[in-house]
From Swiss-Prot:
Residues annotated as transmembrane: 21-41, 45-65, 79-99, 138-158, 179-199, 213-233, 285-305, 313-333, 360-380
Organism name: Desulfitobacterium hafniense (strain Y51)
GO BP annotations listed: serine transport; threonine transport
Entry keyword set: Amino-acid transport, Cell membrane, Membrane, Symport, Transmembrane, Transmembrane helix, Transport
Protein's recorded name: Serine/threonine transporter SstT
Keyword Cell membrane: yes
Length: 406
């Protein structure tokens, strides 16, 4: 048994995940009723990641700031600029693609009972209120903006603490990181359960009716992942960005695709940053921050579904309005984590720019929920893998200036 486990652990995690993926698809297509209990593996995996992530973020960020030496360089400014630039360019890409390949949709009912935010002010206010959330409540609800703010404050307060206290925090961080590695090793079983549940519950037929819309959405996200992001990274590191891009997509994007949660993928991203040799003081802050504000996939979803509604209703859009939509979708996407339902419930906000009534806008949200299995998975994979990509690009850019190899 020990020999079998040793051989299993010697197989790379990505290969093990692919094995779980294939088995999950086969079970869902061939024996969905008999294999139904398999779905619980996915729920347990996502639950474990979501449980450990808030504690990990609090301790890592607190420790990084408490142990930060005066004059020690971090790349947070560069990373923030990359996050915002990437999200904006994703919105621009979605707007241009929607004009090049206009798609009309059959509006769906069923989302009228959900309350969307009233405007961009409400979204930003919600984000600000999350900053001053009760720390215990923030941990319980996985409010990463609140967790980050408390971790930063506690870290600053502990800057003057004794070395033994700082060492204790470091030991706690190492212990939680070890737990995270144990959980991530269970990813193949988790992915098996998640992919089984998705196919067995939703089926493939429900998605075929919105094929063109899905093609446009996924096409935009793939374009951002394989063209826009590599271009941004190249401008930063001045060398072939694709090895880094593909590694981030492979080791972060795959798990994010199936967990459909940027928060649950934080431990995966932190582990990948460690493998890439990045500075822990930087990535322990930038990764949870990215899970909150780096939302290129959300910007694509908001812009594409809004313009699909516009084309369905035959509304003419001029260039200035299209530019405003690009900016609005980027700003709204950055606030998506502060809204229950995420990017889909920010669609009525963007629709209001074109005078589309809330009733129709909520029907567009209904369409979003129908295609959510694919849309949300691709969106999360893009969002989460980009967190690591831009964190690495910012640090490698500094290494290039210093003449260090990477």
């Amino acid at each position: 048994m020990k020999e079998l486990l040793r051989k299993w652990n010697n197989i790379s995690l990505v290969k093990r995940i692919l094995m779980g993926l294939i088995i999950g698809i086969m079970l869902a297509l061939w024996i969905p009723d008999i294999a139904a209990p398999v779905a619980i593996l996915g729920n347990l995996f996502v639950g474990a990641l979501k449980a450990v992530a808030p504690v990990l973020v609090l301790i890592l960020v607190m420790g990084a700031i408490a142990n930060h030496k005066s004059g020690q360089q971090t790349n947070m400014k560069s990373i923030l600029i990359l996050y915002l630039l990437g999200t904006f360019l994703a919105g621009v890409t979605a707007v241009i693609a929607s004009f090049m390949f206009p798609v009309s949709i059959a509006l769906a009912a069923g989302a009228e009972d959900i309350t969307a935010p009233g405007g961009i002010t409400e979204v930003l206010l919600s984000l600000l209120m999350n900053v001053v959330d009760n720390p215990v409540k923030a941990l319980m609800n996985a409010n990463y903006i609140g967790i980050l703010s408390w971790a930063i404050l506690l870290g600053l307060a502990l800057r003057t603490a004794g070395e033994s206290t700082k060492q204790l925090i470091g030991d706690f961080a190492d212990a939680v990181s070890k737990v995270v590695k144990w959980v991530i090793n269970l990813a193949p079983l988790g992915i098996l359960g998640l992919v089984f549940d998705s196919i067995a519950t939703s089926g493939l037929e429900v998605l075929l009716g919105y094929g063109k819309l899905l093609l446009l959405l996924v096409g935009c996200m793939v374009f951002v992942a394989l063209i826009i992001n590599p271009l941004i990274v190249y401008l930063k590191i001045r060398k072939n960005p694709y090895p880094l891009v593909f590694r981030c997509l492979r080791e972060s994007g795959i798990t994010a695709f199936f967990t459909r949660s940027s928060a649950a993928n934080i431990p995966v991203n932190l582990t990948l940053c460690e493998k890439l040799g990045l500075d822990r003081n930087t990535y322990s802050i930038s990764i949870p921050l990215g899970a909150t504000i780096n939302m290129a996939g959300a910007a694509v979803t908001i812009a594409v579904l809004t313009l699909a509604a516009v084309h369905t209703l035959g509304i003419t859009v001029d260039i200035p309005t299209a530019i405003i939509l690009s900016v609005l979708s980027a700003i709204a996407a950055c606030g998506a984590s502060g809204v229950a339902g995420g990017s889909l419930l920010l669609i009525p906000l963007a629709c209001s720019l074109f005078g589309i009534s809330n009733d129709i806008a909520m029907q567009v949200v209904g369409v979003g929920f129908i295609i959510g299995v694919v849309q949300d998975s691709c969106e999360t994979a893009l969002n989460s893998s980009t967190d690591v990509l831009f964190t690495a690009a910012a640090e490698y850019g500094e290494w290039r200036k210093e003449g260090k190899a990477f």
